[in-house]
């Protein structure tokens, strides 16, 4: 008699997509430690080889959130600024700078993240370096959002079930669905998201998954130069999402050209930081209204896109203009001293 796991593996071996109930069973068994290492590795590689679908990724999100420490009780719209990583760039932590700038402008930000993946300084490293609290409980998150419009949710603290997955990921040593899953698992369930991907082919997969998991408004971004953020290096390819929170909505493809906003192109070296200390110093400069011009331009592009999502009716050119003014005024620095 076939077990559920053997049925799942046989389905993947034939190159077929998993039905929702099979996907849910597979991810539940994986996260509960009920698969052997051989089964877990076969499961993850089978998904990768055939190509993960939005429905399969959605079932992975649901299984992970069912086992997560959830954060509730934050009223009104909230946003997360996050990327999949894997762009191979040691760029400054633009997502954290964007999040803090938005918080300084009065928007509620619940940033979910971890240590560095492809940069010199990951979101958690940056938050820690700026002196902001890292090890938070749900009550702390609610209090900090009320106090300063910003809280950081350190992923390992909120996803204990991932301890069953990490050894398998390390042994495999290759990209799996879990490289995409992290940005989708914010336990505070923000209504808005600015999500970056390092590969353009991931745009529809991630956008459709956000829609299915209940996000109301989002932009999934692939930046010029292969970055998982908008950059001054050239036009960004973007999928805009308008959802009803119940899995239904529309997706629209757009392109955003920095030249339209008076931004000069730059090189990857002008966006890079060599180490954590430099990364934190640059962040402080940017949040105070200074910093290197190419990094400031990149920050403006991402803040502007997020404002376009958060403020209904705010056209993108007006959002970019508002972002420029906020950066010049050092809006993000207010959060550090709240």
From Swiss-Prot:
GO cellular component: cytosol
Any Gene Ontology biological process: L-tryptophan biosynthetic process
Cofactor remark from the record: Binds 2 magnesium ions per monomer.
Record keywords, A-Z: Amino-acid biosynthesis, Aromatic amino acid biosynthesis, Glycosyltransferase, Magnesium, Metal-binding, Transferase, Tryptophan biosynthesis
Catalyzed reactions: N-(5-phospho-beta-D-ribosyl)anthranilate + diphosphate = 5-phospho-alpha-D-ribose 1-diphosphate + anthranilate
One Pfam family this sequence matches: Glycos_trans_3N
The protein's enzyme class: transferase
Endpoints of the signal sequence: none
Cofactor(s) for this UniProt protein: Mg(2+)
Keyword Signal: no
Known pathway: Amino-acid biosynthesis; L-tryptophan biosynthesis; L-tryptophan from chorismate: step 2/5
The keyword RNA-binding is annotated on this UniProt entry: no
Sequence positions that bind anthranilate 1: 83, 114
Coiled coil location: none
EC number: 2.4.2.18
Residues that bind Mg(2+) 2: 228-229
Positions that bind 5-phospho-alpha-D-ribose 1-diphosphate: 83, 86-87, 91, 93-96, 111-119, 123
GO molecular function, a single term: magnesium ion binding
Residue numbers binding anthranilate 2: 169
Top-level taxonomic group: Bacteria
Function: Catalyzes the transfer of the phosphoribosyl group of 5-phosphorylribose-1-pyrophosphate (PRPP) to anthranilate to yield N-(5'-phosphoribosyl)-anthranilate (PRA).
NCBIfam families for the chain: trpD (TIGR01245)
Complex and partners: Homodimer.
PANTHER family: ANTHRANILATE PHOSPHORIBOSYLTRANSFERASE
UniProt record similarity statement: Belongs to the anthranilate phosphoribosyltransferase family.
Protein name, UniProt field: Anthranilate phosphoribosyltransferase
Organism name: Nitratidesulfovibrio vulgaris (strain DSM 19637 / Miyazaki F)
Taxonomy of the source species: Bacteria, Pseudomonadati, Thermodesulfobacteriota, Desulfovibrionia, Desulfovibrionales
């Amino acid at each position: 008699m076939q077990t559920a796991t053997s049925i799942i593996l046989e389905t993947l071996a034939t190159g077929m997509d998993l039905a929702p109930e099979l996907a849910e069973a597979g991810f539940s068994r994986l996260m509960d430690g009920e698969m052997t290492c051989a089964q877990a590795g076969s499961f993850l590689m089978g998904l990768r080889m055939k190509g993960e679908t939005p429905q399969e990724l959605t079932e992975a999100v649901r299984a992970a959130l069912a086992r997560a420490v959830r954060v509730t009780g934050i009223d009104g719209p909230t946003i997360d600024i996050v990327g999949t990583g894997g762009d191979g760039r040691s760029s400054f932590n633009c997502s954290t700078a964007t999040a803090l700038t938005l918080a300084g402008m009065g928007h509620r930000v619940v940033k979910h993240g971890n240590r560095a993946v492809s940069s010199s300084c990951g979101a958690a490293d940056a938050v820690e370096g700026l002196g902001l609290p890292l090890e938070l409980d749900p009550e702390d998150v609610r209090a900090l959002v009320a106090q300063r419009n910003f809280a950081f949710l350190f992923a390992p603290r909120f996803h204990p079930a991932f301890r069953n997955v990490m050894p398998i990921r390390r042994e495999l040593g290759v990209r799996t669905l879990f490289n995409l899953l992290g940005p989708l698992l914010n336990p505070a369930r923000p209504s808005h998201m600015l999500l970056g991907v390092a590969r353009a082919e991931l745009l529809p997969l991630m956008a459709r998954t956000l829609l299915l998991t209940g996000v109301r408004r989002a932009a999934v971004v692939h930046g010029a130069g292969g970055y998982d953020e908008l950059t001054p290096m050239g036009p960004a390819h973007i999928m805009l999402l308008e959802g009803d929170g119940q899995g239904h909505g529309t997706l629209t493809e757009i392109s955003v050209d920095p030249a339209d906003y008076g931004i000069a192109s730059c090189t990857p070296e002008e966006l890079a930081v060599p180490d954590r200390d430099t990364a934190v110093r640059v962040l402080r400069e940017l949040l105070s209204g200074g910093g290197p011009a190419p990094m400031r331009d990149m920050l403006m592009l991402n803040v502007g896109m997020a404002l376009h999502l958060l403020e209904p009716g705010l056209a993108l050119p007006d959002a970019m203009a508002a972002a420029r003014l906020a950066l010049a005024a050092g809006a993000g620095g207010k959060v550090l001293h709240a």
